[in-house]
């Protein structure tokens, strides 16, 4: 429902810059900035954009950054070799803002909830997902959590695929 708001507002590009870990106890600093020099983190999970010349430049820039990832990850001091679309989007937004905080990207409506790859998607049924969330200070031990009627970004794709494969279609 909150995504319908995207079509009623005046901005041409919306993206999440804040997120909420379902476990609620973990360090989320890696999802605030992509590096120590202050490039803000944006989630490429859900994006709204209107087709226009500015956004065409943005998406061309995304492709350029992806094709030249090793250069950009060194320039922007991204510690990981692994290409993450979140990092590519974050760098492109930073460039579109003139290498500073700016207003190219506006906030998506609602909240972006997520589970980490340490968490296990256990079951999907109707409008409910059951997770096993890794406990704080007890690696390998989990807390049962049921998530109902809200979107969520699941980072453990292996367990998500297992649940999808078990679903009756």
What are these regions (language model features)?
Residues 1-25:
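GT-A fold catalytic core of metal-dependent nucleotide-sugar glycosyltransferases
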Residues 22-35:
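Short acidic (Asp/Glu) patches
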Residues 34-169:
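A glycosyltransferase accessory/donor-loop signature
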């Amino acid at each position: 429902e909150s995504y319908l708001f995207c079509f009623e507002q005046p901005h041409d590009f919306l993206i999440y810059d804040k997120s909420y870990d379902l476990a609620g106890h973990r360090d989320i600093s890696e999802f605030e900035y992509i590096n120590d020099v202050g490039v803000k983190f944006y989630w490429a999970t859900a994006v709204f954009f209107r087709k226009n010349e500015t956004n065409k430049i943005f998406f061309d820039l995304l492709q350029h950054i992806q094709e030249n990832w090793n250069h950009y990850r060194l320039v922007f001091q991204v510690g990981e070799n692994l290409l993450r679309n979140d990092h590519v989007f974050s760098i492109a937004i930073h460039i579109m803002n003139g290498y500073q905080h700016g207003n190219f990207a506006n906030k998506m409506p609602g909240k972006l909830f997520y589970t980490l790859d340490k968490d296990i998607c256990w079951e999907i049924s109707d409008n409910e997902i059951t997770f096993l969330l890794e406990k704080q200070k007890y690696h390998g031990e989990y807390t049962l959590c049921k998530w109902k009627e809200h979107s969520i970004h699941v980072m453990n794709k292996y367990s998500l695929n297992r649940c999808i494969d078990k679903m009756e279609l």
